[in-house]
Amino acid sequence: MTDIGRTKSRNYKCSFDGCEKVYNRPSLLQQHQNSHTNQKPYHCDEPGCGKKFIRPCHLRVHKWTHSQIKPKACTLCQKRFVTNQQLRRHLNSHERKSKLASRIDRKHEGVNANVKAELNGKEGGFDPKLPSGSPMCGEEFSQGHLPGYDDMQVLQCPYKSCQKVTSFNDDLINHMLQHHIASKLVVPSGDPSLKESLPTSEKSSSTDTTSIPQLSFSTTGTSSSESVDSTTAQTPTDPESYWSDNRCKHSDCQELSPFASVFDLIDHYDHTHAFIPETLVKYSYIHLYKPSVWDLFEY
């Protein structure tokens, strides 16, 4: 089928003024219109969560992060982890914090004694109301006064120009879902037919530096269920090797070159096929957190 034929088959046009987006399925049109109004009708029902998403595939990915089995519990703070490696790293952070806090207390007490002695020698004597904080700035002392106080592993968001940094136990996947995936995208120039098939938000811009640049897209439209079936027909026995080539496994994309990163590949699946394979999300989790691969998949 030609590109013209595919364009004519898109009968569902966005009704927002100035928007020319057209889709071949009413569900994609509704998801696109949600981006105009910032409506997020897909709610997480996990107790205490309440996160909301524009598209159902985003909710499915998010709910997977809740369903992770974390059998390794810290006896000091009750945080839970997937692997022994994660737990050991976390326990080491407790030990480092304890040692550093002791050094801070000893050093801080010595500095305060010197400050008090100096003030006692001045006219007016020592003011007992002086904050027992940093002698340099007069503020209450906090961990933030010392860079590197918490030297646990940190994770930088992989999206360009995003300064988000999460601690080891935070969920970077959810940050990416809420702030990047399906919200900002650079559409390759020179092919206006692509712009008709991609759900975008009012904030999307071809000059947005937080976008993933120059992704490759398929212009064929298939339903979410068809896309899932065509990909999950090959259930990977080893997700690490299955996705490590950063290639789309969809039958329509076999000729595409590998994507620059696993995050570009996730973005491609989301925008082109309207779903994200669960095993790809698990692989990206491995890519971010670097635990033992089989520890993560043994459930």
Swiss-Prot record:
It comes from the Eukaryota. Keywords: DNA-binding, Metal-binding, Nucleus, Repeat, Transcription, Transcription regulation, Zinc, Zinc-finger. Residues 191-242 are annotated as: Disordered. One of its GO terms (cellular component) is nucleus. One of its GO terms (biological process) is regulation of transcription by RNA polymerase II. A zinc finger (C2H2-type) spans 12-36, 42-66, 72-94, 155-179, 246-271. It holds the Pfam family zf-C2H2. GO terms for molecular function: DNA-binding transcription activator activity, RNA polymerase II-specific; RNA polymerase II cis-regulatory region sequence-specific DNA binding; sequence-specific DNA binding; zinc ion binding. A motif (Nuclear localization signal) lies at residues 96-107. InterPro entries: Zinc_finger_trans_reg (IPR051061), Znf_C2H2_sf (IPR036236), Znf_C2H2_type (IPR013087). Residues 200-232 have a biased composition (Low complexity). The keyword Zinc applies. It is found in: Nucleus. The keyword Calcium does not apply. Present with 2120 molecules/cell in log phase SD medium. May function as a transcription factor. This is Zinc finger protein FZF1. It comes from Saccharomyces cerevisiae (strain ATCC 204508 / S288c).
